[in-house]
Amino acid sequence: MAHACVSTSASSLRFTAGFVSASPNGSSFDSPKLSLPFEPLRSRKTNKLVSDRKNWKNSTPKAVYSGNLWTPEIPSPQGVWSIRDDLQVPSSPYFPAYAQGQGPPPMVQERFQSIISQLFQYRIIRCGGAVDDDMANIIVAQLLYLDAVDPTKDIVMYVNSPGGSVTAGMAIFDTMRHIRPDVSTVCVGLAASMGAFLLSAGTKGKRYSLPNSRIMIHQPLGGAQGGQTDIDIQANEMLHHKANLNGYLAYHTGQSLEKINQDTDRDFFMSAKEAKEYGLIDGVIMNPLKALQPLAAA
């Protein structure tokens, strides 16, 4: 007779599917036999890991945001076959990287652009990321628009850039000098190379930095290829940009041209306090809330 629990009878026992039955022969013992309606949990987990190990590379990557990088999130099996292959993919807000499946979802892009638009209504623009033609075109358009809307109110430009194209940076610089409103510049994070040049190009008395920012100046970088004449042309062009940038830096900082030439011969890093002493900026903002409004002259 079958029972739903283990019997303590002296008769021999036979293991069936979750039931215990008495053996028809009480004098001998049958070998235990286990019959389950499904595989044990350990076997199912092992089979699942083997299946995941075969299929995880074929799964569609999902992009997740990490700092300034968009990292495709590839499902990876856990356990003895755990493999993680992280690929750092740089992205730029000026290019719809989501179209290639490696950028933020459209909703994230819309929210980001919405925040930028809200700041723009308060005459706050950003110079963030590498300085290239696309960034320059956007900033130039923003400066011209704000000049047309109200030429009497200051414009605040936040700089967090490692530098970039000299010609693109000069387009922004010339527009800053061309428009009527004062342009207050604020360094947030890093202003290096062309980023530092644009930071120093703000209206004198209205150039600021947050306390933990870093600022770096150096000479233009580039390369050339082709015949000797081609290389000479490119070398002369680099010398022109170097002399032009150093001349403006000397004017913006009050340093002598000889000192600027010497300091920019190699990467010259400064803290916010050192940049103020050097003349690149006019003050260090210890209270970040003050930077949310157009800044008065020091």
Swiss-Prot record:
Transit peptide: 1-100
GO CC annotation terms, alphabetical: chloroplast; chloroplast envelope; chloroplast stroma; chloroplast thylakoid; chloroplastic endopeptidase Clp complex; extracellular region; plastid stroma; thylakoid
Gene3D superfamilies: 2-enoyl-CoA Hydratase, Chain A, domain 1 (3.90.226.10)
Active site positions: 193, 218
Main location (coarse class): plastid
Expression sites (tissue/organ): Mostly expressed in leaves. Also detected in stems, and to a lower extent, in roots (at protein level).
Reported induction: Repressed in darkness. Induced by high light stress and during cold acclimation (at protein level).
NCBIfam families assigned: PRK00277.1 (NF001368), PRK12553.1 (NF009205)
Function: Cleaves peptides in various proteins in a process that requires ATP hydrolysis. Has a chymotrypsin-like activity. Plays a major role in the degradation of misfolded proteins.
Record-given protein name: ATP-dependent Clp protease proteolytic subunit 5, chloroplastic
Organism: Arabidopsis thaliana
